[in-house]
Each structure stands twice: as C-alpha cells, then as structure tokens.
From Swiss-Prot:
It comes from the Bacteria. Its cofactor is Mg(2+). Signal peptide: none annotated. It comes from Anaeromyxobacter dehalogenans (strain 2CP-1 / ATCC BAA-258). This is Polyribonucleotide nucleotidyltransferase. The lineage of its organism: Bacteria, Pseudomonadati, Myxococcota, Myxococcia, Myxococcales. Disulfide bonds: none annotated. The keyword Transmembrane does not apply. The gene is pnp. Residues 699-721 are annotated as: Disordered. Residues 631-699 form the S1 motif domain.
Amino acid sequence: MTPIQKTATVGGKDILLETGKVAKQAHGSVWVRLGDSIVLVTAVSAAEKKEGIDFFPLTVDYQEKLFAAGRVPGSFFRREGRPTEKETLTSRLVDRSCRPLFAEGYSNETQVIATVISFDQENDTDVLALTGASAALHISDIPFGGPIAGVRVARVGGQLVANPTLAQRAEADLDVVMAASRDAIVMVEGGAQEVSEAVMIEALLFGQAAVQPLLDAQDALRAATGNKARRAFEPPKNDVELRAKVKALTWEKVKEAYGRNEKHDRYGRLSEIKKELLQALKDEAAGDAAKLATIALREKEIKGYYEDVKYDYMRKMITDERRRIGGRGMADIRKITCEVGLLPRVHGSSLFTRGETQALVATTLGTAEDEQRVEMLTGMVFKKFMLHYNFPPFSVGEVKFLRSPGRREIGHGALAERALRAVMPPEDQFPYTVRVVSDIMESNGSSSMASVCGGCLSLMDAGVPIKAPVAGIAMGLIKEGEKIAILSDILGDEDHLGDMDFKVCGTAAGITSIQMDIKIGGVTRDILEQALAQAAEGRKHILGEMAKALSAPRGSISAYAPRITTIKIRPERIKDIIGPGGKTIKDITARTGTSINIEDDGSVSIASPNQDKVEEAIKMIRGLTQEAEVGRIYLGTVRKIAEFGAFVEIFPGTDGLIHISELSDKRVKSVSDVLSEGEEVMVKVISVDRSGKIRLSRKEALADSAKKSEGTEPPKGEPAK
C-alpha cells in the first residue's frame, strides 16, 4: 500500500496524518505528527464477539517510549516500567472520548494502542494520541461513529491558543484538553487559575472550532483508503412485545422503589423487582416447557429491558415531573457535614460527608526529600504536591481484593489534585512537600468531589496557607427535545442518566478544575452557560457549609510536622557544607537530627519537628559559610604568632591577619608582648582583598568598643553588635 498523507492546520501549525507506511497488519494505523513530535496509533478488533458480557470490551493504552526524547530509562533493567500517571490519564482521555461512539451492541474485543515515538520538547503528544485514535478507527472496518479530534486550549496573556507549546502552557492561566466532533464537544479535562465560567465556555467553543480541519483530514484519509465498509455484527435484540410486557410488569414498582431515599433500601427493592419480574414470566409460562426454556435462554435480554425501564422512568421523572430521588429539586444539594482535626497525630485531617458519600482525608507535610520523582519525556520531574484517592470496596458494601490503584482511582485523584494545586502557595513561601490522601468511607455519587472538599479542609487544618478554599460539585444534564433538566450534586443512580455529565471545582472567584463528558449534539452556548451557572451556585453553597467547620488555614502547622527554615548562602560555599564525600553535612544531620536539602542556587532548607534543633543546625551552617564583613567587629581566637603580626580565626575555617602595627595605638616591639596563641581577642575587619585575604585590626576594635556605652563583647565567631 502506498503511504497516504493528509494535513490539517490547527493553531497555525500543521498536523500530519499518515497511513500505509507502518503497522499495516493492524485494522487501522495512523502516524500523527506535530512539529517533531510523532505518535503511532493502531486499532485492532477481534473477529468474533466476546460472549457473556454486558459491556463493550475496549482497551486503550497510551505509552511513551523514552527513546522518543533521546533518553535511556533510569530503571535497573533500563526498560520502561509500569505506566506513569500521565500515561494512565491519557489512556483514560482517549477511552472516554471514543467509547461512546462505537455502535451499540458491538462486543468484539477492541484495542487502541498509542505509542509516542518522537518528542520535540515543545508539542505535547496526548492530543495527538486522541486524534490518532479516532483516525485509526475511522479508516478501519470497526463500527465506529467518528470522527472526533483532540485539541489543547490554553489562555496565555489573555489570548486563547490551540495546541500551545510547553513554554506557553507554563504561562497559561487555563489549560484544557478536549475532544470534539462536528456538532458536539465530546470530552473536556483541564484546569485553570480561578477563571470565570464565561472564559471557560469561550475556551470550549474555541476548541471545537479549532478541530474542524482535523475532522476534514480524517474524512479525506478514510476516502483515500477506500472507505472500508463497517463490519457486520449482530445488533442487540429488540423484542417490542417482550419489552412492553417487562414495562407493564415493573413500571409502577420501579416508581415506588425510586421513592425510597436510602440507597441500600432502594437497591434492595430494585433487585427484588427484577426477581419478581422473572418469576412472573415463569408463572405465566407454567406448564409450557418450551416457553420456560425460552425465558431461561433470554434472561439476560429480559434483564436488559428491565434496566431500560429504570432508565426511562428516572429520565421521565426528572424531565416531566421535575422530581429527583429523595424528593430533591434540580439544584438541591444533599445535607453536608464537615469535621476537621479528628486524627490527633496527623498533620491535617478532615471528614467530609455529603448525603451518603463520605471522604476521610489526611494531609502530610514533608521535606524536599519526600518529593515524588517521575521520569518523563521532558526529563526528571519533581512533584511537591500530590493527592491520592482510594476507593475501598467497603465504601459501597462490596467484597473485593485490595489491589494497587486502578485507572479510575488515578483519574479521580488527578482531578482533585488539579483542583487544589491552583490555590497552593509558592515554594518560596511554603517549602513543604504536601501529600493529601482521600479514603472514601462510603459512596453514593460524587466521591471525587468529596475528595476536593475534604482535601481543602484537610490542607487548611494542616496550616497550609492556600490562596482560597476550594469546593467541587458533580452535575448532570438531561435533554429530551426542548425539555432540559440540569441536576446538581448527582447520585450514583443519576450518574449514567445524563446526556452531559460534568464536574466543576473552584473557589468563590472561579474555576480551578473541570471534567466533562457530553454524549449528545446540540448542547448550545446557552445550555453550557445555564449548566455552569448552576454549578457555580452549588459550589458556593458547599463553600459556605465548609466554612462552618474551618473558614481559613490555621495560623501554624501541626506540632508533629517538620519545621522548615530556609537560609541563603553563596553557591560557591555549598562545598563547605557538604564537605569531602558528604562528611560535613552528614555530621550536621547526625548531631542535630535534622534533614538538610541544598539547592544549586544556594538555598538551604533545614527541617525538624524540633525548632531548637533547626536553629542549632543553622548556627553550624552559618559557622561554615559566613564571610568576613568589612567594618564588623568579631571575637576571634589567636591561632599563630609571627614576627609581623598574628593570625586570628574569627569564625570556624576563616582566619585573618592582624599586622603588628594594628595591635595597639602605641608602639609594639613584639607581637608576643600583646597576644599569645589560643587567646581570644576583639578584632575589626578593615579589608578583604580579591583573593579573600582578610586584614584585621585590634586597635580599631578597641577604639570602637570604647565608644559604645554598653561595652558588651560579641559572642565568639559572631559580629559585634
């Protein structure tokens, strides 16, 4: 096959789509290039459907090869290891964008693999993987309803930019990744520095317009490859008569069940209704072996119709009756309770409860040694702020093996981390490494948003001087014709009902994090404005409830947290603190029990829960690095006597010379007449030459001291006051 190329211009830069050159045995293979960043994306789907499942078995894997950036992996085996957080999050982005577009009922195992094979240190590859996944599926025979395309939108200096460089992203106050089709925004994930809802909507519409050339390029690529026919598959059964019978037998019962407020009571009743349905159908067929056998064979189909009844009833209840589970209105928030400081030995803690969703959140303050080190294409990255989300099975009354965090937990943690990172203090004001851990105690929807709220309270309880409190809210939107219902603080039951599910986090001033999944077209600017405005009202209500427990960061950190003090030294004196083979710094840390971190710019951070030990370490470091200051008086020790003068140590490691003429205002015949080795003597620094040689004067020190009414001597090795 001759390679085929199509180009689209986005944000003033060309994006190349190419197929037919590599990975030709995949059902769809596309090479996506922006600048010198290249991602190879392949799509393959099994020939036969997977039996016994009620979901679409799609797997998306995004992987970054370090050779793409000219790097050798730093692991022992010099191979790429387990997926990094970025790889996991990008895999989720692609999955969330593409999954809703596959044909309903298609159940063949499908795998999309996106591999970064070249990285130019300027153009990020996640949006290339997103576009490439759509393109690879679009040119294949897999029943995919694309195309869609990905774009990153940033606001730099007040201007919206499509697919910004890494340097531009560092200056941006808004940074979102989104996927869009011709008539809809499909997926949004990103963060911001407290931007308004209007700015966010402007960015989303800007991004949707920006991807249109990429959609044209994908259609052109499909046409050039022969417009492969979509493979045939067995569509889901739709027995109209049986569907109607299931509805008749269950509708009123479902209506009664959804009137129950308590989650387990409601779920228990809905499960009973399903059993009653199957039994009713069996009773109706009693005595007819063939009918009974048919019911047994079609049990999965019957259960599917029952799920449709639940889905249809809840949407009708919301759009027609304007009523929700528990009798809540569209914008009502469940009851909120907050508690802080409940874990006595933890640096900061909170318990945030909203309805039947609860998060226990702990904050730990650490030093620079506790930073997370992550090897990425851009090099080694050091993270000083982390939020980890855990979802144990007991939170929903289930029994499961405890394993390492899955993609969902990593994704929820990243969303909450992004929401709070926007208000974290700069490192020069708060030099701590901060880890927040959210353990979900119980869940009935919006557990990631409970982690945001609980995380904020936990940070404030720990004394972290955040810029402003942050809250998060999960929202849903249902659109039936002209009827629109926007739901605030959705339950687990409502989570899958919506045509648009979105989570918005932020302060009272603006948005710090957003996540959206939109399943339909026709979501206009007006609808987006209504949805985000209602989310803002809900967010402000939650912030008010949080303020009742703790309205601002505590004035001091926990007694059990390390005290970090940062001092500055001249970079050329770093070697004096470290010593040969690290001997000196090891001695200081051993004697004081502190943790010491030295930056290349001369910043020295000393940490210990005991402030006295910190001060002791600082004194030792000052003694090693302080420099003689002209005009200052020091109390030194005579180290050596010579005919022409005396050498005096004014502080550890630093000597100066008192010439014989500077010993006294009277004539001195011999230095030993005035000084002796080991004697302490007041001296004044009168000059320091370019080579660092220090000239001292005893007579000027005596004269200056005589003028002072207090007549006090300075401590040894320190300037006179």
